[in-house]
């Protein structure tokens, strides 16, 4: 069946690696991670994104639906590629940039917090993501495109 609801959110921000998320004690976020998280949450609270997230929340039924998430991380060419060819070490590992972003978009712990520490996100456990695709692309600037699809829960 075709996707009942699909929304695209573009965040004009750099990807952030989970490797840089926590201090050495592994319990406290670094200042950079806190600032990045706040920037994402502020972007999610923008009128156009707030509307899209609300539409997804209103439609989604955890007994009937799952999420398919598509993430595209855009990097300037000089960051993604090395001068001599190949992929630069400055282009993060995809699996390391997925989780921090997914948590901010999905998790209920951010839903009722005041800005910039929270946003009216999807307010649901990310366990409902059953299909996740991510990729790195060259772009004019850093940005992240998040495509959120609500799919019918498979019956098998």
Segments and roles (model prediction):
Residues 1-156:
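Acidic, proline/glycine-enriched N-terminal capping motif
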